[in-house]
């Protein structure tokens, strides 16, 4: 083995509740939609493209409105996670630090820009990956 690649959600932490809280704030602030997202709803769209997520969660909005709201949700989410991190799995930070001494470590995800950085900062592993 010459390196290790990690996914984020379900591997390093569980951010579903924090992401739902951030998206609900964005929805209330930037739209007139009367919806509340939770971990179950978000779990059903995690892993999909942002276009698909917008189509599923915000079907009544125009494409422009969806894009704008999704942008706001993602931006607010990345900032929110810095102060309200997900549930960090036990031993993740220590394990990452130890592994980094022997292997190059990488994170890959199909998430929006800034999410991996917010995750690494929240967990405290940005120096090791």
Please report, for each region that a protein language model flagged, where it lies by residue.
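Substrate-recognition element of Asp-dependent hydrolases with the DxDx(T/V) motif
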Residues: 23, 95-120
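N-terminal helical cap/lid subdomain that shapes the substrate entry/recognition surface
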Residues: 2-8, 12-90, 101, 112
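Short, glycine/charged-enriched secondary-structure capping and boundary segments
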Residues: 18-21, 120-124
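Conserved H-loop
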Residues: 126-129
């Amino acid at each position: 083995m010459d390196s290790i690649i990690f996914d984020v959600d379900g591997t390093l932490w569980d951010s579903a509740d924090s992401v739902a809280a951030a998206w609900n704030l964005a929805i209330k602030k930037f739209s007139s939609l009367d919806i509340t997202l939770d971990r179950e709803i978000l779990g059903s769209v995690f892993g999909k493209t942002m276009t698909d997520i917008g189509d599923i969660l915000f079907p009544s909005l125009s494409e422009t409105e969806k894009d704008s709201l999704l942008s706001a949700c993602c931006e607010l989410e990345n900032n929110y996670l810095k102060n309200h991190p997900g549930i960090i799995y036990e031993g993740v930070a220590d394990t990452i630090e130890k592994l980094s001494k022997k292997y190059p470590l990488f994170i890959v995800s199909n998430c929006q820009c800034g999410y991996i950085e917010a995750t690494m900062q929240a967990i405290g592993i940005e120096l090791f990956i």
